[in-house]
Amino acid sequence: MMEKHYVGSEIGQLRSVMLHRPNLSLKRLTPSNCQELLFDDVLSVERAGEEHDIFANTLRQQGIEVLLLTDLLTQTLDIPEAKSWLLETQISDYRLGPTFATDVRTWLAEMSHRDLARHLSGGLTYSEIPASIKNMVVDTHDINDFIMKPLPNHLFTRDTSCWIYNGVSINPMAKPARQRETNNLRAIYRWHPQFAGGEFIKYFGDENINYDHATLEGGDVLVIGRGAVLIGMSERTTPQGVEFLAQALFKHRQAERVIAVELPKHRSCMHLDTVMTHIDIDTFSVYPEVVRPDVNCWTLTPDGHGGLKRTQESTLLHAIEKALGIDQVRLITTGGDAFEAEREQWNDANNVLTLRPGVVVGYERNIWTNEKYDKAGITVLPIPGDELGRGRGGARCMSCPLHRDGI
């Protein structure tokens, strides 16, 4: 059955969301490979899974539909064309050589779709293939080397695709460790019965090509509503990516303006939503560094000829106030003294998921910031994050809204 897919804001009633429960991919994380796979530490996978279940159930108890990425991927593999396409793109002849790649694809094609989905996100080692598959490539690798690397960052479903008004951007990811995630989402949006044939726009990123420097990640994209989109230019999202998305939004008349803000290029400010989220009509949670007066900010609008008009803004807050038609933005800054605020920002105190105006989900460990939310009239539904938080992502990072009301 075709579902409605529309995201009209950051704060309207959330109705449907895609999550990814930690699985095999996190079990593959080790101290020697976690940096390459963009994690700072290894997690207790069982405990992270329990924490994620509490997160998912918190959403369900609020009447929100929760779809799990592994389920969607498993169901997508029931479509022969989708299965063939995924095997061809994820098991590349150019990576493994044509004969070995063919043998691996043939073997994978025979397993259950649940197991295949598990490997498409969790990776595959040489030790897991049958001894009957013989090849020079096998002979020259250690049994614990990866044929297909794991995708532990699938946990952060926000980044790989983002719904903006009546369409979706299927994002070309900046780091090699995440680029294969996009193919899993391309397949789901092309072939899964929930999405196939749906009347939604694919703004950007659906083609399996090299996007070079035009990278974009959903953690940098805030659909602030009223025809406006706020995008952070971070260590992951480039001005080139912003321009492609803005042009598509204007071409399809889905947005009237895109506000682009330059972010510091460091790990603690990986995406805009690690330092800023929209939690009520006039209220944002922020780490103060991002709203300094000297931060570069532009508003992009259509130039009337298929291009972009760029206007330098005096401040980010002024640009947001104009876009939303409000007199003054209310800011709730990260709580505690300077040391506590830095610690809580690192632990995703600002990375909350708004369920409806003034109601958010966030990690219970951020006691100083949660206290500030409470005093400001914002209700926090707390979830544990001692293990999940080690991945440097909070409730917003771990969720991809599929249906949300406008404002």
From Swiss-Prot:
Q: Where is the active site?
A: C397
Asked if the record carries the keyword Glycoprotein, the reply is: no
Catalytic activity line of the entry: L-arginine + H2O = L-citrulline + NH4(+)
What InterPro entries does the database record attribute to this sequence?
Answer: Arg_deiminase
Tell me the pathway: Amino-acid degradation; L-arginine degradation via ADI pathway; carbamoyl phosphate from L-arginine: step 1/2
Q: Listed GO cellular component terms?
A: cytoplasm
Q: What is its main location?
A: cytoplasm
Pfam family membership, one: ADI
One of the entry's Gene Ontology molecular-function terms is: arginine deiminase activity
- What Enzyme Commission number(s) appear in the record? 3.5.3.6
The UniProt keywords, alphabetically, are: Arginine metabolism, Cytoplasm, Hydrolase
The reply to whether Nucleotidyltransferase figures as a keyword in the UniProt entry is no
Judged by the first EC level, this protein's enzyme class is hydrolase
Q: Which domain of life is it from?
A: Bacteria
Where does this protein reside within or beyond the cell? Cytoplasm
Question: Mind telling me what this protein is named?
Answer: Arginine deiminase
What organism is this sequence from? Answer: Escherichia coli O81 (strain ED1a)
Q: Gene that codes for this?
A: arcA
